[in-house]
């Protein structure tokens, strides 16, 4: 019986507290105040722009009909936070298009960003992807993957991308 009274008392106290909270909010709003719950969120606008250099002239890939083997394409990933909250642990990923190969040491970013690479279509990323290589004696050894095996490049910034801030990342690929 004593347990039932305790439960009933807790229920009554909870209901009273809830009513006080609701009535306080209504009174505040009726007195000209505003009452809202706002959650700040990032809203990232990402664009990818490509450029090629021909005859010492830089051309947008949008203005080029075709690319030729041996030409280097310069990619820029532009990220802008148009929201009202910071994007923490922000990452941008660039794909290595079919028919091209990543140019070693070409990945750069504004700000302090870690650069990692994928050789499995973006499932995993590593600063130095490794593959298994069968040795002459039949054993298997882990060795660095060839740059030609890279399928994606990822940029991960240490600092958050704050509202109204922009970040750019760059990488090059060579047409096969």
For the regions a language model picked out, list residue spans one by one:
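Exported/extracytosolic protein signature
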Residues: 2-16, 22, 26-176
């Amino acid at each position: 019986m004593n347990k039932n009274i305790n439960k009933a008392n807790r229920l009554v106290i909870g209901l009273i507290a809830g009513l006080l909270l609701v009535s306080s909010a209504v009174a505040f709003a009726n007195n000209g105040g505003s009452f809202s719950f706002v959650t700040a969120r990032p809203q990232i606008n990402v664009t990818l722009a490509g450029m090629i250099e021909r005859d010492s002239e830089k051309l947008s890939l949008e203005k080029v009909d075709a690319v030729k083997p041996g030409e280097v394409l310069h990619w820029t990933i532009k990220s802008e936070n148009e929201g009202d909250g910071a994007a923490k642990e922000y990452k941008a990923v660039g794909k290595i298009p079919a028919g091209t190969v990543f140019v070693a040491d070409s990945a750069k970013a504004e700000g302090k960003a870690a650069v990692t690479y994928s050789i499995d279509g973006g499932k995993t990323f590593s600063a130095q992807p490794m593959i298994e290589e069968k040795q002459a004696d039949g054993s298997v050894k882990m060795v660095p993957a060839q740059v030609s095996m890279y399928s994606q490049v990822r940029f991960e910034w240490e600092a958050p991308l704050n509202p109204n801030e922009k970040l750019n990342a760059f990488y090059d690929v060579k047409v096969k």
